[in-house]
Amino acid sequence: MSNFNSSPVPTIFMSFFQMTKRVRLSDSFNPVYPYEDESTSQHPFINPGFISPNGFTQSPDGVLTLKCLTPLTTTGGSLQLKVGGGLTIDDTDGFLKENISAATPLVKTGHSIGLSLGPGLGTNENKLCAKLGEGLTFNSNNICIDDNINTLWTGVNPTTANCQIMASSESNDCKLILTLVKTGGLVTAFVYVIGVSNDFNMLTTHKNINFTAELFFDSTGNLLTSLSSLKTPLNHKSGQNMATGALTNAKGFMPSTTAYPFNVNSREKENYIYGTCYYTASDHTAFPIDISVMLNQRALNNETSYCIRVTWSWNTGVAPEVQTSATTLVTSPFTFYYIREDD
């Protein structure tokens, strides 16, 4: 058996050892990137341990380059930023700046783009919105007329007496149901009374009687309850009830002082509206009631800017009810119209 240590090394292993020997760099090799050999201008294939693949790559092998993703690029050996139509590079200071022009209704102020708003537009919670004036509202994102704001009333049927008509009464003796609705330049008025106190209902036992509800208003159209027969303020409609908020301006519901002036005797007849309503007696007989409406004409004091007086009267051969069978006095509704004051 031959000794292994004395055997010659096979040629194939010798070649492998020679190939794996570290190549000796020339004395002119520059160890600073790009690692050129000054004598040959060659890039030796090296991969220093301080080069991270994060942000760098070798392309081709041995040549260190940057990894660039849009909007970065390299053009002519320089790292550059791709800019679109809205950006540019300032030639003076090299700063990146916007290159945007604004067309109407957009406006550019400094570095901000804004929207020029005209009447009827505004912002709410950073959203563009339409401004709605009094009488308009949104319904399912559509603009519509707020019918409630065009109505001023006592409600459908007050739960308790709200009006004191009889001079002998020390408290409210009836319910006055009044509705005023603005319709263009006119107001449509709807009125009737329901008796509450026994004294008021006993009026039906008289053959000749009249009673008046006086309504006095200030310059904004608010009812002066201390002076008026109606002791509860009017308010806008909210469903079948009165709105609960304060009434700010009801001037547009008032009778026009131009059409129905105060204290002008020569035009006194213009201030009156006449008509007929009815009382249905216990035996179902319909008794006619004369009704007259006086608009403005006489002011009670300096507080009064507008007034409406409604008078009911009858003069019949027999009383609607006999003395011992007085029932609730309910007049049928009466509708009338008048020219309204400007809002």
Swiss-Prot record:
Expression triggers: Expressed in the late phase of the viral replicative cycle.
Swiss-Prot/TrEMBL keywords: Capsid protein, Host nucleus, Host-virus interaction, Late protein, Viral attachment to host adhesion receptor, Viral attachment to host cell, Virion, Virus entry into host cell
GO cellular component assignments: host cell nucleus; viral capsid
UniProt main location, coarse: virion
Subcellular location field: Virion; Host nucleus
Top-level division of the source organism's lineage: Viruses
Pfam families in UniProt: Adeno_knob (PF00541), Adeno_shaft (PF00608)
A GO BP entry: adhesion receptor-mediated virion attachment to host cell
UniProt cross-references to Gene3D superfamilies, sorted A to Z: Adenovirus pIV-related, attachment domain, reovirus attachment protein sigma1, domain 1
Function statement: Forms spikes that protrude from each vertex of the icosahedral capsid. Interacts with host receptor CD46 to provide virion initial attachment to target cell. Fiber proteins are shed during virus entry, when virus is still at the cell surface.
Note: All late proteins expressed from the major late promoter are produced by alternative splicing and alternative polyadenylation of the same gene giving rise to non-overlapping ORFs. A leader sequence is present in the N-terminus of all these mRNAs and is recognized by the viral shutoff protein to provide expression although conventional translation via ribosome scanning from the cap has been shut off in the host cell.
UniProt family annotation: Belongs to the adenoviridae fiber family.
Complexes and interactors: Homotrimer. Interacts with host receptor CD46. Interacts (via N-terminal tail region) with pentons.
Domain note: The tail region anchors the fiber to penton base capsomers, whereas the shaft, built from several repeated motifs, allows the knob to protrude from the virion.
Protein name in the entry: Fiber protein
Lineage: Viruses, Varidnaviria, Bamfordvirae, Preplasmiviricota, Tectiliviricetes
